[in-house]
Regions:
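Juxtamembrane transmembrane-helix termini in multi-pass membrane transport proteins
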Residues: 2-75, 140-157, 161
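Hydrophobic alpha-helical transmembrane segments in multi-pass integral membrane proteins
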Residues: 58-60, 130, 135, 139, ...
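Alpha-helical transmembrane segments and their lipid-water interface positions
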Residues: 25, 51, 55-63, 85-91, ...
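Hydrophobic/aromatic residues within the transmembrane alpha-helices of Major Facilitator Superfamily
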Residues: 16, 20, 53-54, 90, ...
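Membrane helix-loop-helix hairpins that form the core translocation module of multi-pass transporters
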Residues: 39-119
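Selective transmembrane alpha-helices of multi-pass membrane proteins
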Residues: 69-103, 161, 165-173, 184-212
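Selected transmembrane alpha-helices and immediately adjacent juxtamembrane segments
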Residues: 116-117, 124, 128-133
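Short alpha-helical transmembrane interface motifs in multi-pass membrane proteins
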Residues: 9-14, 86, 122-126, 157, ...
Length: 212
């Protein structure tokens, strides 16, 4: 068991570096946390954690490697991800041109908020799942760092670690941007912030679409 611990630490270190590098997940969670309530950012962080765990599971099962070899399917996911990011970014840019408008509707009734939390979770998961770079990342991780024929518990521990790291990091980002002080600043500068976040997401989507 002990000789598997350094491998888990290596995986954790590589994944931590990937997590703290700003990308679509980061910008999406940042905007939802700023525009909505604290719970919406946390729900989107949970969605990203779900998506990360799904990609890692597919890589463990070998599906991610197969996916990379089927050009039309891989490119289909890449284009779908690019369209999703561009669509989300355009919504933000459009909202930034409208006084008092955000892409998250803050409603007071508990059933509506439950629906908003589900939509935030779904947005986080789809943002992660439609990014084929996640497929390439986890395929390379399992090809280079995973031991040959590890015990079953190793897979379980690795998946749990990946999920907890993802939710922990993005949950912290959500909480940081959902504080009252940050919210007050966002309300003053909502339009330029939404415009910048939207433009960044559109740019990331365009870059993803242009990649071969």
């Amino acid at each position: 068991m002990h000789h598997y611990l350094p491998i888990l630490l290596q995986i954790a270190l590589v994944y931590l570096i990937a997590l703290i590098s700003p990308g679509p997940n980061f910008f999406m969670i940042t905007q939802l946390s700023l525009a909505g309530r604290r719970g919406l950012g946390a729900a989107s962080a949970l969605g990203v954690g779900t998506g990360s765990t799904v990609w890692a599971s597919l890589a463990m099962l070998g599906f991610a490697t197969v996916l990379q070899r089927i050009d039309w399917l891989y490119n289909g996911i890449r284009i779908a991800g690019a369209i999703y990011l561009v669509w989300f970014g355009i919504k933000l840019v459009w909202a930034s041109t409208k006084r008092g408008e955000t892409i998250v509707v803050n409603v007071e009734t508990p059933p509506a908020m439950r629906g908003a939390h589900f939509r935030a979770w779904r947005t986080g998961m789809l943002t992660c799942l439609t990014n084929p770079k996640s497929c390439a990342f986890w395929t390379s991780i399992f090809a280079t760092l995973f031991p040959a024929h590890p015990p079953l518990w190793f897979y379980g521990v690795a998946l749990a670690m990946i999920g907890m790291m993802s939710v922990g990091w993005y949950g912290s980002v959500a909480l940081m941007f959902a504080t009252e002080r940050t919210q007050r600043g966002y309300r003053r500068l909502r339009r330029p912030i939404d415009g910048v976040c939207g433009a960044l997401l559109v740019g990331l989507g365009a870059k993803l679409a242009a990649e071969s």
